[in-house]
Amino acid sequence: MKLFISADIEGCAGVALAYETHKNEAAYGEFAKQMTKEVVAACEAAHEAGADEIVVKDGHGDATNIDPLCMPDYVTLIRGKSGHPYNMMSGLDDSFDGVMYIGYHAPAGNPGFAISHTSTGNSLYIRLNGSCMSEFMLNSYTAASHKVPVLFLSGDSTICGLAREMVPDITTAVTKTGLGASTYCKAPGQVEESIRQGVKKALAGNLSRCSVELPETFTYEAVSYTHL
């Protein structure tokens, strides 16, 4: 079984403020370590469930957040930005059996998480076919274009709910819950265990149950905070 994991940092355990995800801030290092731990938890669980080849795409910022020295032997880690239009999904193709997401977050325009955004912090909101477009939505349509099922997501409670609306049979693991500008965070160990259990559950049974159907047309609307 060959799996693709796209990882972000804002939805990982403990992250509550944007500056905690910036490399030039003292707080960043510990959260990058936690991002690495959650990715490793997903990889180990997937391997135990039968995955013999796993590709992980570091999808945050300059894409050099995950510690490559912590990756298991059966994992290929994609670091840095190639300029490929798939961005957080760069490396995905038709050969994969499933896609998983670690550390994902609510989209721009959704008040469910203090640092909700889509791609950058410049957009007030982005709508696709009338719905606020999350990175999960965009990346899942990328997976759908290759007919690769979307199996698992970890992140804040808002993006977990939105993921289930789009893919009813997806397995999710909630890492935190937002309330206004505050964030109710689960303990890192609890999050890692819920990822392990969730990944194993996601890989049980027929993976095609989590296939995403591409719309016939796309209507895209973006509103930024400032004039371009």
Where are these regions (language model features)?
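Active-site rim beta-loop-alpha module in soluble metabolic enzymes
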Residues: S145-P149, S154-R196
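Glycine-rich nucleotide/cofactor/substrate-binding loop typically near the N-terminus or early
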Residues: V39-D94
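Active-site glycine-rich loop that binds ribose-phosphate moieties when present
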Residues: T120-H146, G155-T158
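Extreme N-terminal starter segment of soluble prokaryotic enzymes
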Residues: M1-L3
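Short catalytic helix/loop segments, enriched in acidic residues and glycine
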Residues: T21-A41
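Flexible, glycine/charged-enriched surface loops at secondary-structure junctions
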Residues: A49-V56, G205-T217
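Short glycine-enriched loops at secondary-structure junctions
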Residues: S6-C12, G59-H60, I102-A108, S157-T158
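Conserved small/polar residues in nucleotide/adenosyl-binding loops
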Residues: T226-H227
